[in-house]
């Protein structure tokens, strides 16, 4: 395991909402929710910290957000402007290193082991980047500094907003032991529920389990979690990373025969895929359905649409059609997955925040 790298994860604080509050003084100090009209279909893209105090969070239906925060200010947002500001932030990053891996408009990994300013301390680089972003753009960012991407990303969320958390190789295992396992990469709702049933709530709980036992209970997730909780991750910062597909899949706790359960899963996946596509500023043209039967036979079916889309309803309709064509209801399903491929950048003026 290479512990000599100096990795920073920068995560802008409530990015879209912060840009709006910066540009519109009337929004400052008020619960601002980006996601469109709460009386129509849509979900929250992001919200200000004032709105978060009421329990509002991203991916929540706007109608639910309105109930939690009746005095909230709802706006559609301006994606083209957020892209412009994101590019300004990346220009600041490039003053320090060319090894930059953007994850979305509002976050990125930076490898500053060999940085352009010859600074020996990654912590000082992170602080200077935070200060520069605030001074030049009037926005705050949180930073995590460590020797690998996994720990740096967790650390950036530790002292939000505008905080910085440094985790050295010597501190890594103790730091990870206190972290809820729901914060670990790859732990979604289904895996979190399995971990909860196993009595695993924190990194410390996770560390008590052997590698074999975790793999037996969680399969490939167990393999990765065993390494992550020990700070073992050698993934490099990849400036050429380009997502070729966006998808979601789940392995059911019990094999499923009911097509309605499968349809419900696809609907949830479509919403999640839509959210990720919009964050990546992409849309796709090919929908892929994956089914794994109880005997571990796996099939994939794909449908190429007439036009590119990032709309959950269109993605779901295509997936549901593939399900009808593929599933007879005679054999139970162990795993179901939905992926959108054939991606290309979205024309920003056509991005629909309201129908996220």
Curated annotation (Swiss-Prot):
Poorly processive, error-prone DNA polymerase involved in untargeted mutagenesis. Copies undamaged DNA at stalled replication forks, which arise in vivo from mismatched or misaligned primer ends. These misaligned primers can be extended by PolIV. Exhibits no 3'-5' exonuclease (proofreading) activity. May be involved in translesional synthesis, in conjunction with the beta clamp from PolIII. Its main location: cytoplasm. Residues 1-188 form the UmuC domain. Its cofactor is Mg(2+). InterPro entries: DNA/RNA_pol_sf (IPR043502), DNA_pol_Y-fam_lit_finger_sf (IPR036775), DNA_pol_Y-fam_little_finger (IPR017961), DNA_polymerase-Y (IPR050116), DNApol_IV (IPR022880), PolY_HhH_motif (IPR024728), Rev_trsase/Diguanyl_cyclase (IPR043128), UmuC (IPR001126). Pfam families: IMS, IMS_C, IMS_HHH. The gene is dinB. The active site is at 107. This is DNA polymerase IV. Belongs to the DNA polymerase type-Y family. The record marks 16 as: Substrate discrimination. It is found in: Cytoplasm.
């Amino acid at each position: 395991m290479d512990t000599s790298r100096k990795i920073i994860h920068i995560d802008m604080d409530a990015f879209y909402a912060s840009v709006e509050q910066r540009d519109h003084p009337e929004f400052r100090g008020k619960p601002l929710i980006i996601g469109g009209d709460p009386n129509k279909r849509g979900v929250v893209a992001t919200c200000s910290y004032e709105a978060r105090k009421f329990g509002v969070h991203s991916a929540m239906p706007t109608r639910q957000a309105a109930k939690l925060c009746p005095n909230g200010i709802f706006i559609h947002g301006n994606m083209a402007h957020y892209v412009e500001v994101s590019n300004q932030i990346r220009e600041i990053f490039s003053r320090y290193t060319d090894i930059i891996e953007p994850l979305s408009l509002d976050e990125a990994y930076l490898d500053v082991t060999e940085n352009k300013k010859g600074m020996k301390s990654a912590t000082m680089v992170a602080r200077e980047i935070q200060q520069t972003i605030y001074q030049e753009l009037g926005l705050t960012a949180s930073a995590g500094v460590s020797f690998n991407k996994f720990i740096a990303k967790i650390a950036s969320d530790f002292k939000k907003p505008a905080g910085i958390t440094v985790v050295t190789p010597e501190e890594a295992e103790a730091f990870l032991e206190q972290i809820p396992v729901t914060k670990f990469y790859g732990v979604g709702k289904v895996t979190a529920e399995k971990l909860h049933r196993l009595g695993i709530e924190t990194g410390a709980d996770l560390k008590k389990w052997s590698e074999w036992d975790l793999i037996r209970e969680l399969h490939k997730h167990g393999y990765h979690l065993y390494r992550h909780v020990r700070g073992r991750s050698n993934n490099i910062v990849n400036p050429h990373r380009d997502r070729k597909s966006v998808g979601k899949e789940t392995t059911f706790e019990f094999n499923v025969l009911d097509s309605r359960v499968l349809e419900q899963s696809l609907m949830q996946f479509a919403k999640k895929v839509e959210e990720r596509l919009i964050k990546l500023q992409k849309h796709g043209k090919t929908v892929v359905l994956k089914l794994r039967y109880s005997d571990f036979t796996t099939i994939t079916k794909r449908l190429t649409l007439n036009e590119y889309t990032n709309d959950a309803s269109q993605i779901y309709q295509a997936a549901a059609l593939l399900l009808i064509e593929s599933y007879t209801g005679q054999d139970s399903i162990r795993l179901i997955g939905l992926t959108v491929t054939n991606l290309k950048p979205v024309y920003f003026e056509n991005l629909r925040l309201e129908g996220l």
